[in-house]
Amino acid sequence: MIWVAVIITMLLFILVAKPTGIYLEKAFQGSKTLDKVFGPFEKLIFKITGVKAYNQTWKQYALSLVLLNGFMIVVVYFIFRLQGVLPLNPAHIEGMEPTLAFNTAISFMADTNLQHYSGENGLSYLSQLIGITFLMFAAPATTLALVMAFIRGLAGKELGNFFVDFTRALTRVFLPIAFIAALVFVALGVPQTLDGAVTAQTIEGAKQSILRGPVASFVSIKELGNNGGGFFGANSTHPFENPGQMSNILQMMLMMLLPTALPFTYGRMVGNKKQGRILFVSLFMVFLLGFITITTSELNGNPALNGMGIEHVQGSTEGKEVRFGTVFSSLYATVTTAAETGAVNTMHDTLTPIGGLVPLVNMMLNTVYGGVGAGFVNIIMYAIIAVFISGLMVGRTPEFLGKKIEGKEMKLIAVTILFHPLLILGFSALALSTNLGTDAISHSGFHGLTQVVYEYTSSAANNGSGFEGLGDNTPFWNITTGLVMFLGRYFSLITMLAVAASLKEKTVVPETVGTFRTDNSLFGGIFIGTIVIVGALTFFPMLVLGPIAEFLTLK
């Protein structure tokens, strides 16, 4: 029965992808999509803010994005620091320590949601609502806006205006869907209140303080925007965030909704729907491979316990919630790292070595399917590399969407693709070379190495999940992961926007018999091969020293 439920869940991922992709294309191409509802509201926003809907250059678009995001980071930083004297603080929580406030503000603006604090004890309601929830809308709206400009550039059109795209992302996508999802979560038992903690008496006669809050609205945008941060420290393992299997499936659907839709949006906007389908199918195959790998490993149990003769009918159940089971916990772990969300319904630090390898590889690739917007930019980056390599093999100038890929574009892409591993491996080496980093490790040996690399991989990929055995709430970890999140977020977005702007200016080369097609299964295979060879092999030495070595030595 459990496998039937898994198949139905997978089918739901597929069935909602195309309609959502079509809606996104209409929403950002100026077609009528609920204009009577949102049109007046948008016009009012533009009038108040003074936004003029003129087309921007790629530099203007990128500068607008960075300045707005930077302003939000500063405002939210001071909210976190001053929350102790601000209203809506029934638990009388004190202001955040400076480096933790720095880390948290960047984390949520970068759509990472890495949390070095426990949500229910570290933030007031005001900080949760005005700081965290606000950024949970603003961060994915930023990247969804940028990816639309990116696709327009690839299609040879004007990039558009960042502030218009940002507003449309909020009003046409995130606010309405999150509102509906929040109502469903309330119906499924997720609390939504501004009241303080309630005191309950246990069956043993002791008193217990049960924390609650505006959880349903928080969870809806947490998953839809691929944010992932938890209202509670236990994230989606907490019964108030994720009461049962229905809420569990809904959360996974929300996580996958926009990342799986973007290939279809892209296909329609560039006039090549088949290429969009090829990208979707190719990535879904990689996703399935990851799910099968982690599930097989978790169902086989822990080798150390197996050697003691302990039965593992349910597989490796350490760190997992009984109400979800091993299979759905494995699916959730695959989804949350494939869609770069970072929400967890199981503790990733307790996964088997190969089980923990899959989320790690998903984040290292950062392209299956990736988070809202940012992940799709990486998908196209790998697609262009696949075309470039194919062109070199047959001695032709590579072309993508009928435009020649030349030195300028490949230099930008080369720098971008190297920057991700440099962030991860460089900062991991720094942490391992100083006591400031190694003192946080709770496990010696191979697993300790994986803890460190997972933290920086999650930060660079804007995922936010962690091997929580790592004691990361220290100035060293707060500052270094904050820098990695910021650089990992904005560098690739800006460089790839420059690539799209460069391609926009080029004339379309007429298609000939020798043109390498990017809308067939051959390209799909080369695309997957490029992701594996260029992406995965970059990190292979580290994977051998970490989870693979742990797997081979665990008895």
UniProtKB/Swiss-Prot annotation:
InterPro entries: KdpA (IPR004623)
Bilayer topology: Multi-pass membrane protein
Compartments (UniProt record): Cell membrane
Coiled-coil ranges (or none): none
Keyword Secreted attributed: no
Key words, A-Z: Cell membrane, Ion transport, Membrane, Potassium, Potassium transport, Transmembrane, Transmembrane helix, Transport
Main location: membrane
Ion transport as UniProt keyword: yes
GO biological process: potassium ion transmembrane transport
GO terms under cellular component: plasma membrane
GO molecular function: P-type potassium transmembrane transporter activity; potassium ion binding
Transmembrane segments: 2-22, 60-80, 130-150, 173-193, 246-266, 278-298, 374-394, 412-432, 483-503, 525-545
Superkingdom, taxonomy of origin: Bacteria
Family stated for the protein in its record: Belongs to the KdpA family.
Subunit structure: The system is composed of three essential subunits: KdpA, KdpB and KdpC.
UniProt-listed HAMAP family: KdpA (MF_00275)
Role of this protein: Part of the high-affinity ATP-driven potassium transport (or Kdp) system, which catalyzes the hydrolysis of ATP coupled with the electrogenic transport of potassium into the cytoplasm. This subunit binds the extracellular potassium ions and delivers the ions to the membrane domain of KdpB through an intramembrane tunnel.
Protein name: Potassium-transporting ATPase potassium-binding subunit
Organism per entry: Bacillus cereus (strain ATCC 14579 / DSM 31 / CCUG 7414 / JCM 2152 / NBRC 15305 / NCIMB 9373 / NCTC 2599 / NRRL B-3711)
Taxonomic classification: Bacteria, Bacillati, Bacillota, Bacilli, Bacillales
